[in-house]
Regions:
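N-terminal signal-anchor transmembrane segment
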Residues: 1-53, 69-79, 364-366, 381
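Membrane-interface helix-loop-helix junctions at transmembrane boundaries of multi-pass membrane enzymes
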Residues: 4-13, 48-63, 175-189, 225-237, ...
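Loop-to-helix entry and N-terminal half of a specific, functionally important transmembrane alpha helix
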Residues: 15-22, 124, 192, 341-370, ...
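Aromatic-anchored transmembrane helix interface
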Residues: 60-72, 82-105, 115-124, 167
């Protein structure tokens, strides 16, 4: 046993490092299959072979996501051409398995949460810097990190790049407001890079997601901590951060190229949103059409019938996964938000990570009304974090109940 124990500890460290590296790779998706898919496919497969445990708490996530993808498989029967459909559902199933994987390894050890968020933050800073440098054409060939004069970092789409940066930005905001002041300059610098990357993505969804989730985070922190000194610190640092970001925005807007694109993108409703067969018209027609198609129409078919894809996660669930998939996805999302909300204010070592993940899930569900988040890798990571933390809470309560019984059994004396 003495020999086996160090070996087990070494294997756990290697496993945790492999997970952190996988999360880091999620920030670099220029082409598909991306390095993230290749790495995580091997990692998830190996971990399952070695005996990954799925507890009763995380089993509903597995059941709902598998049912969601069964709906996708049924929708394939409605397609005339199966050229791209099966691969799309295969990717969906793989992403579902990554979510289960993250939930299970977090339940196994909450110490993996800092590794996950630090790796995510590191990847976010690097990909954000690539987007910023590309936007300003800092070196030859840097335009590969932009699309339509919008920063996209090491992603294919600015609308995915921007939201990817938001959860690590929230993590940094929490670290600035509640962490050690010695690390404040480093965290503030990293946050500024992420904020600039989000801004230069010119994604209205990312802008709204960042602004609203930061406000929700600050509100919940003020609600949880009742210390007057802590609340004063949060308010002062929040005010300082707002002033710094506002000043950075003013400086960025002095660049004519930035100012022009900002003026165009800052409009709440663009021409392609409100015109005939625009975004909102397609939503209306699509929902009406899906009321008559219980099995959906198949992956990527909607874009061949209309000028663009669904750009709505609820409509996407109906078209690509049918009624079964839609009910499963909505049920999974509601369950995720309920679990997180119920445990979010408890004083636990994993509470900050749960809070950031829950707020991010809520924000992504909201922007899902105007954008498709179906194949966003980081969204499945967020699902896994919330469910993993919920499983940690169940295990914590079970342990707390058993300890008094053990003490009572050892120390109690009965008289006849």
């Amino acid at each position: 046993v003495r020999v086996a124990q160090p070996q087990r500890l070494t294997l756990r460290l290697i496993g945790s490092a492999a997970v952190a590296f996988g999360v880091f790779l999620s920030g670099f998706v220029i082409d598909e299959p991306a390095p993230y898919e290749l790495w995580m496919a091997g990692l998830v497969g190996l971990w399952f072979i070695l005996g990954l445990k799925i507890s009763r708490t995380t089993a509903p996530l597995l059941a709902l996501l598998l049912t969601f993808n069964i709906g996708g498989m049924l929708s394939l029967t409605q397609m005339r051409d199966l050229a791209t459909g099966p691969m799309y559902i295969a990717v969906s199933t793989f992403l579902a398995l990554t979510s289960i994987f993250y939930a299970a390894i977090i339940e196994d050890s909450h110490k993996r949460l800092p590794l996950i968020f630090n790796a995510w933050s590191f990847a976010a800073v690097i990909t954000s810097m690539l987007g910023i440098l590309g936007y300003f054409h800092a070196f030859p060939g840097s335009e590969v990190f932009t699309l339509y004069d919008r920063a996209k970092g090491a992603f294919q789409d600015p609308n995915v790049f921007g939201p990817f940066l938001v959860p690590p930005a929230l993590y940094l905001v929490h670290g600035i407001l509640a962490g050690n002041l010695r690390t404040l300059p480093i965290k503030a610098g990293a946050l500024l890079i992420l904020a600039l990357g989000i801004f230069l993505s010119f994604s209205r969804a990312a802008w709204g997601l960042f602004a609203v989730t930061v406000l929700i985070l600050i509100f919940i922190m003020l609600l949880k901590e009742r210390s007057g000194a802590f609340r004063l610190r949060v308010l002062i640092l929040s005010l300082g951060a707002i002033i710094l970001m506002a000043a950075s925005l003013v400086v960025a807007l002095q660049v004519p190229k930035v100012s022009e694109l900002f003026s165009a993108r800052a409009q709440l409703v663009q021409q392609y949103d409100g015109e005939h067969l625009g975004r909102f018209d397609r939503h209306r027609i699509g929902f009406q059409m899906m009321m008559e198609r219980p099995l959906g129409i198949g992956p990527l078919v909607f874009g061949t019938m209309f000028p663009e894809d669904e750009h709505n996660i609820w409509l996407k669930s109906l078209t690509t996964y049918g009624w079964l998939g839609f009910v499963s996805y909505v049920g999974m999302l509601c369950w995720t938000l309920t679990l997180g909300f119920r445990n979010m204010l408890l004083d636990r070592p994993w509470q900050p990570f749960l809070m950031v993940a829950w707020i991010s899930v809520l924000g992504h569900a909201t922007i899902g009304n105007v954008i498709d988040i179906d194949h966003w890798r980081h969204v499945y990571l967020l699902f896994g974090i919330v469910w993993g933390c919920a499983a940690l809470e169940v295990r914590h309560r079970r342990s707390a109940r058993s300890q008094p019984l053990e003490k009572f059994g050892k120390g109690a004396k009965f008289r006849a």
